[in-house]
Amino acid sequence: MEKIVLLLAIVSLVKSDQICIGYHANNSTEQVDTIMEKNVTVTHAQDILEKTHNGKLCDLNGVKPLILRDCSVAGWLLGNPMCDEFINVPEWSYIVEKASPANDLCYPGDFNDYEELKHLLSRTNHFEKIQIIPKSSWSNHDASSGVSSACPYHGRSSFFRNVVWLIKKNSAYPTIKRSYNNTNQEDLLVLWGIHHPNDAAEQTKLYQNPTTYISVGTSTLNQRLVPEIATRPKVNGQSGRMEFFWTILKPNDAINFESNGNFIAPEYAYKIVKKGDSAIMKSELEYGNCNTKCQTPMGAINSSMPFHNIHPLTIGECPKYVKSNRLVLATGLRNTPQRERRRKKRGLFGAIAGFIEGGWQGMVDGWYGYHHSNEQGSGYAADKESTQKAIDGVTNKVNSIIDKMNTQFEAVGREFNNLERRIENLNKQMEDGFLDVWTYNAELLVLMENERTLDFHDSNVKNLYDKVRLQLRDNAKELGNGCFEFYHKCDNECMESVKNGTYDYPQYSEEARLNREEISGVKLESMGTYQILSIYSTVASSLALAIMVAGLSLWMCSNGSLQCRICI
């Protein structure tokens, strides 16, 4: 009879109403890394590293770049005859120069402080070319014969368009004294040069005077140049050399030239009409008729991500360059579908990765929620409040990370002349060091935030579990797997009250107490029955053993195998 009662009690326990706390799972295979683990599969993740570009040169915020094609910056500014398409250029967003442009200084020589001039251009968006000393004004000098086969144009000798190579006229080279006053409101870029002949014969042939000089002065510049006559190997068919110089003439300032030979005079100058962020970018790409906010030598980036790994040199509103190959932020939960039935490592709070062994793919409308079963059926229901708070929290955190990191960031190349190689090497080492620090910071940030996000989800599930536990108290039994088994009947209305936090503990406490005591009584009665049976079994076994020993002894005494002596 006791066994039948026990069996009925067990059956009734199996059919008891239950409510479980759980979390969302899906078919996602996205993985993230944390401080403690690698390749953690999560339900949702967000990539914050841009790895793609369009492979084109694009307008930057609607403004076209100045693509110099086969011309260098020097060829453009001095007016190499092969660069006539750049005689007048509109506003540019950035300048593109090939690594080794064919049309540079056609007449061999050097451009003084060339790298510094390029740095100036990286803060300029528009030049306006103006004539400052007309070519026709050199009545006492030959301003037409100063051409060279090194600078051909349509098969004939020519020269730079923006400067004038002055030669003697009628066997005389009178001393030049010229001035130009900058009456413009803008700064003016002025260029001039000096010719270094191959020998003394060439010197007198071109300039008549054997000893010459060039003097240039402004309010901030005091320069005196003399030609260096020397025998040199031919470059572009020329043994002579030309050296070019430049200065920025401020408004209301004047520039004065004095020379008795070897003078390359300015005809045109460049009015700096607009200053702003620009860059000189080394690239072999072609124009792609596109628009972007961020340009690299590899192509344009159109992305809202805070990091990229495409190229360290950029112009525009760009993500920060890092050397990483993967930066993924966890936004969802650990993805542990219940069917896997395997225990994961514990998180900080141990909820998702601890006593709740698997997520629910059937719960699709929230991150956390409930599964109930009673006589009316079973089903999943998301906890909208905790889910929305979690979504808001994670979204705000991701946006905050992106906002903090996704500031305007430009990294343009710096150029150094041959005398500055040690500075260039030091600059490269510093830039590499900065990139290493940025990369380390970005990777560490992602690892820490992923750990915090997953623990945040663990904590939310634990909080939801505690919310239910505190409501039910002893009206239900904790099963240890995230579920509670009611000691009373709990219909759908009762289940809903547990979910929304309005469960009426006193209403069900009496029924729960009676059922709890009945179950406890069955257990105790069963335990007592088994104890009595155990005692009876022990006594009976001992008595049977004693009888067997006595019978064996009498039999052995009767056949002489055992001698029995009774002493009184």
From Swiss-Prot:
The keyword ATP-binding appears for this protein: no
Please list the GO terms describing molecular function: host cell surface receptor binding
According to Swiss-Prot or TrEMBL, what is its membrane topology? Single-pass type I membrane protein
Which ranges sit in the Extracellular compartment?
17-531
Cysteines engaged in disulfide bonds, as pairs: C20-C483, C58-C290, C71-C83, C106-C151, C294-C318, C490-C494
A Gene Ontology term for the protein's cellular component: membrane
Sections of the chain in a coiled coil: none
What spans does the record annotate as topological domain Cytoplasmic, numbered to this chain? 553-568
Q: Which domain of life is it from?
A: Viruses
Pfam families to which the protein is assigned, alphabetical: Hemagglutinin (PF00509)
One of its GO biological process terms is:
clathrin-dependent endocytosis of virus by host cell
Which sequence ranges are marked TM in the entry? 532-552
Q: Which family does it belong to?
A: Belongs to the influenza viruses hemagglutinin family.
Q: What else is known?
A: Major glycoprotein, comprises over 80% of the envelope proteins present in virus particle.
Q: What is this protein called?
A: Hemagglutinin
